[in-house]
């Protein structure tokens, strides 16, 4: 459970600030385009003067956008395909939950816990600091907290 005040703070304040700051950085280099996923998948391609701003704020935007997209008022189950992949990777849904909970609760300071598809196409639980995104590590996030 996440209370309404915390949700409001993250949606209307934090996320909006990430969007505003990412847009301000992108305005300095219109030649690189606005595809944050592509840019953050290859951070070395981002001009040095805006690189950290895009890592921080672009990552914050993408992380929160996925978080909002996945949020539902009702409890939902993973698709049959994802459930099978979770069982194959972790042994059971309960073992996945334990790994995901550990990734979330052992993150020192602020950050995210993730279920990602790694470069080898396999599921993996990982954690990133602050607003770092697994996209920058060549991973596709499918669940984030």
From Swiss-Prot:
Q: Does the keyword Manganese apply?
A: yes
Q: Which GO molecular function annotations are given, in alphabetical order?
A: metal ion binding; superoxide dismutase activity
Record EC number: 1.15.1.1
Recorded GO CC terms: cytoplasm
Task: Print the keywords alphabetically.
Answer: Iron, Manganese, Metal-binding, Oxidoreductase
Name the reaction it catalyses.
Answer: 2 superoxide + 2 H(+) = H2O2 + O2
Ligand binding (Mn(2+)): 10, 64
Substituting residue 95 to D results in: In strain: NEM1126
User: What highest taxon heads this organism's lineage?
Assistant: Bacteria
The residues the record assigns to binding Fe(3+) are: 10, 64
Pfam family for this entry, one? Sod_Fe_N
* Biological role stated in the UniProt entry: Destroys superoxide anion radicals which are normally produced within the cells and which are toxic to biological systems. Catalyzes the dismutation of superoxide anion radicals into O2 and H2O2 by successive reduction and oxidation of the transition metal ion at the active site.
Q: What is this protein called?
A: Superoxide dismutase [Mn/Fe]
Annotated source species: Streptococcus mitis
